[in-house]
């Protein structure tokens, strides 16, 4: 045998042997803030759903509490994990998200639904190849600690409620951290639009009525009973908690190691959907603006990243002396804002128009806009 032939055979032989590193290569996470590190809105949320309709309460960045026809009260918190007590800590996680039952609902209505959820843009889920014969299966892995033992569900929902696939996992021991992996079957029938609109939701069932729990695990479909099959009621007692950490959704039928991002990288991803430049910090200059009247100033606000779409704007905690948004002239004369609205907005910037009572300054004067209190919030939202 020639030397060249021997080398060629050796190379071919070597190429067919998968290395351990390749076999264990971690997959990219389709979810954002799966480690629950970013919390621009705050770290604790008291939630009282409207029992007559659908509510989505955003909590830690990218995560919301989905409540449909639910009539009970909850507190959602970012928890700090501790070594020696919380097992996810040993795997690099420092935070979790917890839903605490404040007012119990022992018997939810037949179609009541309470779930912890995240929505994904269509252009971010194209790697699943849904709607094609080569569609990919995927795996969700996470840590869970629930007071209520028994069957729980992870559901992948086509946004708008047009079909779902649900998989079960079990909480074996009450209030104990356990690790779960579930494999989501490929969807060969439905193509998610390749746009910035919502295409898929991941939902962790918390409390669900009998209409949606009476079935069994199944491939993609729209049978009501298979939405959260066998889901226990985590909110039937005020002593109950529902807590998860380290959530990863990736391509393939096996879970791989969670890829921990630096905080800045995760924050940049979150800013596409929500931005609060204050985040509870007082005495913060926001921008300078030009007066358009003696009671109005306009400022151009440039977002730190391009947002998913033109955002909505909300000003929180304003209008009381010493507690809110303040406008100040160079001379020191100041006024407290009574309103703030967007007069124009796109995905890169907005014009913020701020008004106050009582004439201060004059047209074309420059005014400084700043927060004078830790409770002041300026919130731009382009959530799905």
Where do the PLM segments sit?
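Extracellular and organelle-lumenal recognition/adhesion modules and their flexible linkers in secreted
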Residues: 3-384
